[in-house]
C-alpha cells in the first residue's frame, strides 16, 4: 500500500497508528529514504476523519484560487482590484472555506513571503486532484507536480 492509498476507493486503512507508521517506514526504506524510527506516532485512528469528496473539492477550489493569487503577487508585487474581484467571483460560496492565510492572499493582503510559500500549495493540490481521480499518476514525488495540468483542470 502506498502512502496515499487510503484515499483510493476500496483501500483498507491499517487498523492502528503503529501499523500505518510501520508501513510508511517500509515504503520509505525501500525508496532509500533515511528514516528516524524513534519519531512518535502522529495520530491514532480515532483522531483521523476521512474527508468526503465534497470536502476535497472545496479544498481544491480554495487552494487553486489562493495559488493563482499568490503567483500574481509573487510576479507583480500585488493583486489588482480586478484580480481580487475575479478570485472572489471564482470562489463564490467557497469564499468562506478559505483558510486565514488563503484569505489574506486572495484579498491581496499577503506579503511576498506568504505569496511564495502559498505557491507551494501546488504540491498539495496535486494530491487532492489525485484523490479525486483527476490526476491519474502522481509519480514518485521526486519532481515538482505538473503545474500546467493542475491549471487546466480549473
Which residues are covered by each model-predicted region?
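Extended, charge-rich alpha-helical interface modules
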Residues: 3-154
Amino acid at each position: 500500500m502506498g502512502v496515499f492509498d487510503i484515499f483510493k476507493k476500496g483501500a483498507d486503512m491499517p487498523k492502528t497508528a503503529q501499523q500505518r507508521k510501520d508501513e510508511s517506514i517500509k515504503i520509505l526504506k525501500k525508496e532509500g529514504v533515511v528514516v528516524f524510527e524513534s519519531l512518535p506516532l502522529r495520530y491514532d485512528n480515532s483522531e483521523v476523519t476521512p474527508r468526503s469528496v465534497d470536502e476535497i473539492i472545496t479544498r481544491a477550489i480554495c487552494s487553486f484560487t489562493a495559488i493563482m493569487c499568490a503567483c500574481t503577487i509573487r510576479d507583480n508585487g500585488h493583486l489588482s482590484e480586478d484580480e481580487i474581484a475575479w478570485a472572489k467571483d471564482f470562489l463564490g460560496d467557497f469564499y468562506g472555506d478559505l483558510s486565514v492565510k488563503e484569505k489574506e492572499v486572495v484579498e491581496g493582503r499577503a506579503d511576498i513571503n506568504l505569496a511564495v510559500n502559498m505557491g507551494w500549495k501546488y504540491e498539495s493540490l496535486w494530491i487532492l486532484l489525485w484523490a479525486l481521480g483527476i490526476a491519474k499518476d502522481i509519480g514518485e514525488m521526486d519532481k515538482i507536480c505538473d503545474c500546467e495540468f493542475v491549471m487546466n483542470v480549473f
